[in-house]
UniProtKB/Swiss-Prot annotation:
Subunit structure: In the presence of PdxS, forms a dodecamer of heterodimers. Only shows activity in the heterodimer.
Lyase found in the keyword field: yes
Gene Ontology annotations for the cellular component aspect, listed alphabetically: cytosol; glutaminase complex
Name of the protein in its database record: Pyridoxal 5'-phosphate synthase subunit PdxT
Any single Pfam family the record assigns to this protein: SNO
NCBIfam families the UniProt entry points to: PLP_synth_Pdx2
Gene (name only): pdxT
HAMAP family tied to this protein: PdxT
Catalytic site: 79, 170, 172
Catalytic activity: aldehydo-D-ribose 5-phosphate + D-glyceraldehyde 3-phosphate + L-glutamine = pyridoxal 5'-phosphate + L-glutamate + phosphate + 3 H2O + H(+); L-glutamine + H2O = L-glutamate + NH4(+)
Family as reported in the entry's similarity comment: Belongs to the glutaminase PdxT/SNO family.
Amino acid sequence: MLTIGVLGLQGAVREHIQSIEACGAEGKIIKRAEELVSVDGLIIPGGESTTMRRLMDTYQFIEPIKAFAAKGKPIFGTCAGLIMLAKHIEDRDNAHLGLLNVSVARNSFGRQVDSFEADLEVKGLDAPFTGVFIRAPHIISADESVEVMAEYDGRIVMAKENNILGCSFHPELTDDHRLTQLFVEMVKTYKTKLAV
């Protein structure tokens, strides 16, 4: 069985685990860097990016997550997780993990009172997906190597580059598990290549 970890530092960790399990994979909360070896893919959930970075530094996650990605293991960052993955962050001198060749702007749809839901056309899905946006970032620009997966109001809100997937919204806060399933399929593909 596939095992997908959810970084358990902050955010809707339990909801991500439930979504993973609804897709037929095993979900595991990751609280220590050494636990990364036990999972085939990793979800970095939403939360507050500055706090998340501080916790990642405290628990020494930055280099182990970079090494995890370098092995080709898939990573999915949602909301603040997208900010953690981005190579460039507007109004910030340096990136956090720098694994996805995109530039992001934080809180680009407004503060928490401006949280909203929107139906999105997502590449690979046959019907719209309802995105839950909460103090969401968006992707300002993406490298040629990056596949744009979804846009909202002219802004990129989901992108994929090789084994790295990121979105501005919270797929775990709906009962629609198709985006988690998309990530599970990425992890399956990685495992299949490994077995050859």
